[in-house]
């Protein structure tokens, strides 16, 4: 194990210092997989690899790498965003505080594909870091992506919206749900596929959230779907009716 650690670190140092930017980038593309190699290692992940992932010098006493410059390179930023869940999973939720600021900076990255990658894995991050950290750090990200300037980012997050909400405490999930009807009628009024992404989750959310939905948001969303000008959404609204009655009857 120690030999493997040393060899990997030597290789990554050499590749990071290569004269070719393409070689450096190709090496960095492997960073998530290399870090994951240590998920069962009793000594944990070498700190040098974590620092490399964060855009810092591999040795703590070195100075040089500018994290701001590192993140402005969209290729590197996208690699970090894509590998974030795997790296946090390997390091464990107790190390989230170390990576949190880097994650937050990526959520406001200028390049849409970087934010889109984070939106795609938001529900996975919630499962990894747990409800408390999710409420503190990921709900603000979710709120931001609900209104992202890029429709694709919002659409990507909405694909797994139900999984994200079911990771939250009941009250936090209710607060998230409370925002959605207004978004349907304003931000998403001219984006039918965003409305469809929301509507698609309603049948699955009704059995788990309806009885705690004191504000009636799920009923409101069902009615909005039933009255939507898009036929596919009206069909989803129709599906919601028997599920709603069944849920009330069973409880």
Model-derived features: positions:
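Extended, low-complexity, acidic/polar intrinsically disordered regions
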Residues: 1-251
């Amino acid at each position: 194990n120690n030999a493997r650690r040393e060899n990997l670190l030597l290789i990554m140092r050499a590749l990071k210092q290569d004269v070719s930017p393409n070689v450096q980038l190709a090496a960095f593309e492997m960073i998530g997989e290399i870090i994951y190699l240590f998920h069962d290692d009793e000594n944990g992940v070498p700190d040098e690899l974590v620092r490399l992932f964060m855009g810092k010098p591999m040795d703590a006493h070195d100075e040089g790498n500018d994290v701001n410059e590192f993140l402005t390179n969209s290729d590197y930023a996208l690699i970090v965003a894509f590998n974030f869940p795997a790296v946090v999973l390997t390091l464990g939720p107790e190390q989230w505080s170390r990576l949190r600021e880097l994650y937050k900076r990526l959520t406001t990255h200028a390049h849409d594909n970087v934010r889109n990658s984070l939106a795609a894995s938001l529900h996975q991050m919630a499962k990894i870091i747990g409800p408390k950290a999710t409420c503190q750090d990921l709900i603000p990200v979710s709120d931001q992506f609900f209104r992202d300037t890029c429709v694709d980012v919002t659409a990507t997050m909405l694909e797994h919206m139900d999984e994200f909400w079911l990771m939250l405490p009941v009250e936090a999930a209710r607060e998230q749900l409370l925002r959605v009807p207004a978004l349907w009628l304003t931000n998403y009024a001219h984006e039918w596929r965003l409305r469809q992404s929301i509507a698609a989750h309603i049948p699955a959310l009704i059995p788990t959230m309806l009885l705690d939905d004191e504000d009636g948001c799920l009923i409101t969303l069902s009615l909005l779907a039933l009255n939507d000008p898009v036929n596919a959404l009206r069909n989803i609204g129709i599906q919601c009716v028997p599920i709603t009655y069944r849920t009330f009857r069973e409880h």
